[in-house]
């Protein structure tokens, strides 16, 4: 009986075929979906690594940020508020007029100005703001003989309406907005302001309080009719 046997070449070919079949069974063809999944996994891994690498003390605290913002805002507003304090009182609604047709002068606290008390704390040459006619800031003037002048000087610049401070060193009213200047009586001596500061009568009533009364007569500084009447 003849036995059948395979030649070495045939056996080698069969082994190669078997290995190729096994390899093809294990090999998975890459698809678009597989690429997307791998990419997402890599991105997620990178983000996770970055987030976990930030120290806890470097993470912004929202409450701290709010507090710092408020402190910064307060710091910025302080200088402006401080500069406005001397003039803020004079932008409140004006008080009612006096019984004699005048308007009581009010100090920075809103109290009536009593002439005798005022002169105790304001010396010769003093010019201090009070609230006058229609609520306008108005300077009370102390004469060299330690008496109150019979006129008050409206502090509103005739250029664009800024409140004009008194400069004692230069003995002038100097407007900080555009450089207008007025002498000690409020007469304009340098533009761009076109006119002198307005006047008001400063009278003293029976109770010793200072009253401002509208000035309708000739302006004694210029000899002209009052432009503000």
Swiss-Prot record:
Catalytic activity, reaction form: 2 oxidized [plastocyanin] + a plastoquinol + 2 H(+)(in) = 2 reduced [plastocyanin] + a plastoquinone + 4 H(+)(out)
Transit peptide: 1-50
Keywords annotated in UniProt: 2Fe-2S, Chloroplast, Disulfide bond, Electron transport, Iron, Iron-sulfur, Membrane, Metal-binding, Mitochondrion, Mitochondrion inner membrane, Phosphoprotein, Plastid, Thylakoid, Transit peptide, Translocase, Transmembrane, Transmembrane helix, Transport
Transmembrane annotation, as ranges: 68-90
Induction behaviour: Light-dependent expression. Inhibited by acidification of thylakoids (below pH 5), sucrose and norflurazon (caroteonid synthesis inhibitor leading to photobleaching).
Enzyme class: translocase
Cofactor binding note: Binds 1 [2Fe-2S] cluster per subunit.
SS bonds (residue pairs): 162-177
Phosphoserine: residues bearing it: 196
GO biological process: nonphotochemical quenching; photosynthetic electron transport chain
HAMAP family: Cytb6_f_Rieske
The protein's assembly and partners: The 4 large subunits of the cytochrome b6-f complex are cytochrome b6, subunit IV (17 kDa polypeptide, petD), cytochrome f and the Rieske protein, while the 4 small subunits are petG, petL, petM and petN. The complex functions as a dimer. Interacts with PGRL1A. Component of a mitochondrial large protein complex that contains, at least, MIC60, DGS1, TOM40, TOM20 proteins, and petC/RISP.
Annotated protein name in UniProt: Cytochrome b6-f complex iron-sulfur subunit, chloroplastic
Source organism per UniProt: Arabidopsis thaliana (Mouse-ear cress)
């Amino acid at each position: 009986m003849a036995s059948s046997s395979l030649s070495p070449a045939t056996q080698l070919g069969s082994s190669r075929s078997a290995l190729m079949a096994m390899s093809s069974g294990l090999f998975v063809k890459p698809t678009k979906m597989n690429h997307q999944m791998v990419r997402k996994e890599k991105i997620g891994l990178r983000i996770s690594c970055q987030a976990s690498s930030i120290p806890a003390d470097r993470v912004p605290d929202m409450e701290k940020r709010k507090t710092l913002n408020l402190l910064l805002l307060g710091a910025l507003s302080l200088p402006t508020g401080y500069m406005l304090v001397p003039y803020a009182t004079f932008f409140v609604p004006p008080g009612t007029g006096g019984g004699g047709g005048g308007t009581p002068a009010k100090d920075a606290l809103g109290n009536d100005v009593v002439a005798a008390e005022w002169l105790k704390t304001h010396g010769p040459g003093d010019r201090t703001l009070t609230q006058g006619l229609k609520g306008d800031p108005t300077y009370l003037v102390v004469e060299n003989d330690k008496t109150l002048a019979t006129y008050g000087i409206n502090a509103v610049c005739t250029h664009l309406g800024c409140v004009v401070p008194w400069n004692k060193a230069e003995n002038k009213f100097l407007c900080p907005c555009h450089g207008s200047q007025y002498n000690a009586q409020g007469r304009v001596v340098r533009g761009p302001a076109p006119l002198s500061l307005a006047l008001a009568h400063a009278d003293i009533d029976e109770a010793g309080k200072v009253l401002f009364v509208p000035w309708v007569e000739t302006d004694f500084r210029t000899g002209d009719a009052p432009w503000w009447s």
